[in-house]
Amino acid sequence: MNKKSIRDVDLKGKRVFCRVDFNVPMKEGKITDETRIRAALPTIQYLVEQGAKVILASHLGRPKGQAVEELRLTPVAARLGELLGKDVKKADEAFGPVAQEMVAAMNEGDVLVLENVRFYAGEEKNDAELAKEFAALADIFVNDAFGAAHRAHASTAGIADYLPAVSGLLMEKELDVLGKALSNPERPFTAIIGGAKVKDKIGVIRHLLDKVDNLIIGGGLAYTFVKALGHEIGLSLCEDDKIELAKEFMQLAKEKGVNFYMPVDVVITEEFSETATTQIVGIDSIPSNWEGVDIGPKTREIYADVIKNSKLVVWNGPMGVFEMTPFAEGTKAVGQALADAEDTYSVIGGGDSAAAVEKFGMADKMSHISTGGGASLEFMEGKELPGVVCLNDK
C-alpha cells in the first residue's frame, strides 16, 4: 500500500482523531454483534502503546443529522472499555467546548469516544466547517473505518484537508489484501458473485472479468443469466432490463478465456418460509409457478471443486436465501468448501457473505473477512475510495 499508516508517524503525546467503524447492531440499548469494535482494537491498542491521546469518532445508524437518544455511542464506549481493560471516557458531543475540555484533560494513552458524528447534518454533506471543528481537536487524523471508506464525509475525508492523514492497521490490512487480490493475484483466481440483484454487481463483474480465471454466479442474480440463455425461470427473481447485459457478460467471459460457472440445478419452492417444501430440479426445468431460491447439490459439487483448485477466492454475495433454513444449503456448501480448501486464500467481501460465514460458524476458517460491504464492493469495481484517496502518500 502506498499510503502512510500509523506505523509511519511519531504518535507520542499527539492528539489523534481516529475515525473507526463502530456502527454495530443494537437491540434495546444492547450491542448484539461487537465484531466491528473488536476489529478496531489492534489500532486503538497500538495508539495507546505509542503514547497517543486517542480520540475515537464513529457513526451509528442513520440519525439523519440530529441527536437520537438510542443512537448515542455510550454503550459502545462502555464495551470498548471492557475490551481494552481500561477506563474509556465518552463525550456527549463530537466537537465544541465540552469535547475540547475533555481532550485538554487527556494524558498519553488515554482513550475518549466522541458522540455519534451523524448527529450533525454536516457530516454526510462533507461540510468543511464541521471537518475543521473535528480537526481542531487533534494533531493527526487516522482513518481506520474501511466500512465507511467509500463515503466522502466530514469525518472520513473532509478532515484530511486540515490534518496529516494516515491509515490505521485495519484499513491498511483491508487495502493490502484487496489490493493484492486485484493487482497481483495468485492463480487460479476465482470470484464468486451472488446476492439478489445483477444491478448491484454490474461494476464488480465487469471489473473482475479482466482479472479472474473463474467466475462463479449464484444467488438471485443468477436467474437473469439463466433466462438470458433461453431457459424458463418460473417465478424466480429476474431483471428483464439486464438480460442483454447478462448475455454480454457471458460473451465477454468467452472472449477473455474466463470459465463462467452457472447453476446446473436449483432448489425451488412454492412458498417463501422457514417450513417451505422444496424440490430440486435441473436449471431448464423450473415449473411456471415455482421460484428458485438456492443452488442445487450438483452445482454445489461443481463450485466446491473449482474452489478447491483455486489459489485465491474472492466471495461476494450468498448463493441463496441463507437466512431461511430450507434455502441455506448452497451458501453453506460454498462456505464449507472454502473452509476445507488447504491451499486457497479466501477473501470474504463483507456484507451478507460475512454474515453467512459467521452464522455457519466458519469465520475462523476464512483467510480474510472484509469489514466493509459497500466499500469492498466499490474497491472490487476498481473505484477510488474517498476515505483512502485523502490519506498521505508514503
Curated annotation (Swiss-Prot):
GO terms of biological process kind: gluconeogenesis; glycolytic process
Q: Which GO terms describe its cellular component?
A: cytosol
Annotated residues for binding of ATP: K201, G292, E323, G350, G351, D352, S353
Q: Which InterPro entries match?
A: Phosphoglycerate_kinase, Phosphoglycerate_kinase_CS, Phosphoglycerate_kinase_N, Phosphoglycerate_kinase_sf
Q: Which residues bind substrate?
A: D21, F22, N23, R36, H59, L60, G61, R62, R118, R151
Question: Which cellular compartments is it found in?
Answer: Cytoplasm
Q: Which UniProt keywords apply?
A: ATP-binding, Cytoplasm, Glycolysis, Kinase, Nucleotide-binding, Phosphoprotein, Transferase
Modification type Phosphothreonine: residues: T299
- What EC number(s) does its UniProt record assign? 2.7.2.3
Top-level taxon:
Bacteria
Which CDD domains does the UniProt record give? Phosphoglycerate_kinase
Recorded metabolic or biological pathway in which this protein acts:
Carbohydrate degradation; glycolysis; pyruvate from D-glyceraldehyde 3-phosphate: step 2/5
Q: Name one Pfam family in it.
A: PGK
Q: Please state the protein's primary subcellular location.
A: cytoplasm
Phosphoserine PTM positions read: S183
Q: Which reaction does it catalyse?
A: (2R)-3-phosphoglycerate + ATP = (2R)-3-phospho-glyceroyl phosphate + ADP
Q: Which GO terms describe its molecular function?
A: ADP binding; ATP binding; phosphoglycerate kinase activity
Quaternary assembly: Monomer.
Family indicated by similarity:
Belongs to the phosphoglycerate kinase family.
Q: What is the name of this protein? A: Phosphoglycerate kinase
